[in-house]
A protein has these predicted regions:
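Conserved DHp (HisKA) dimerization/phosphotransfer helix of two-component histidine kinases, i.e.
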Residues: 11, 24-101
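A residue-level detector for a conserved hydrophobic packing site
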Residues: 122-123
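Short beta-strand/loop element within the Bergerat-fold HATPase_c
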Residues: 141-151
Length: 240
């Protein structure tokens, strides 16, 4: 194994989870997880087939402890208002990435609803919440809708016949926690607008809808396969 990678892991595990070390801890975690494939290959021996996963688990535990530390400044972060059109375009692009191997197009029908949160967190959370439904519904016309409010996050997925069989593949009630966990991993706590403003997007996944805006993206299946990235781990309700 490259000595530099071992050095980074050792350095990370030696740091105390304090506000003073927060920047270095996050930087090291990102660097280590960016080389996770390399770590798996180099530790996948007959004697220690799980060594790489254990190392990454230790690194993630360090990040969780930092996120749960009351002294950390990330507990007090907030996000400014973002433009709805730009936010929704990002959601469309990322969702289309999930569908690119099926050669399907994504259409978006906008609704003017205000939102006060970080756009990248909404994009990541939406991708996670509907990815399973999309993955197991290839070849169907699916409609996915996401509603985020001050106290709730609800995801609904239906097929072209109006049946909600795909809904069983996701857990709507865990949505808000998933969003919050992602926010914590990215250095903040998601705070919705105090007046209860919410974000709502209705999307239709089809190749022949008569209206809407069409977006294209190249194949990106490796994103879904890399379940050990900090973002994916944070989205799976694994935070303490």
């Amino acid at each position: 194994m490259p000595y530099s990678l071992l050095q980074k892991i050792d350095r990370l595990l030696s740091l105390e989870e304090t506000a003073e070390n927060e920047g270095e801890i996050r930087e090291l975690v990102n660097e280590i997880f960016a080389r996770s494939d390399e770590l798996y290959e180099l530790t996948a021996t007959a004697s220690e087939p799980e060594r790489g996963k254990k190392m990454l688990s230790q690194c993630l535990r360090k990040l969780r402890t930092l996120n749960n530390n009351k002294e950390s400044a990330l507990k007090n972060c907030d996000y400014s208002f973002v433009e709805l059109d730009k936010l929704l375009e990002g959601v469309c692009l990322c969702t289309n990435i999930l569908l690119s191997e099926s050669d399907m197009n994504l259409f978006f029908i906008p609704e003017k609803v205000a939102v006060s949160c970080c756009p990248s967190l909404i994009v990541d959370s939406f991708m996670n919440l509907i990815s399973n439904a999309v993955k197991f519904s290839k070849g169907k016309n699916i409609t996915a809708s996401l509603t985020l409010g001050k106290r709730q996050c609800v995801v609904s997925v239906t097929d072209s016949a109006g049946e909600e069989d795909a809904l069983s593949l996701i857990r709507p009630k865990s949505g808000l926690r998933s969003v919050q966990n992602t926010a914590r991993l990215h250095g903040g706590r998601l705070l919705f607008a105090s007046n209860g403003s919410s974000f709502s997007a209705r999307m239709a996944l089809s190749a022949d809808l008569p209206r809407g805006k069409r977006y294209h993206a190249p194949p990106f299946s490796s994103y879904l396969e890399n379940r050990f990235s900090p973002v994916h781990l944070g989205l799976c309700d694994c935070m303490d």
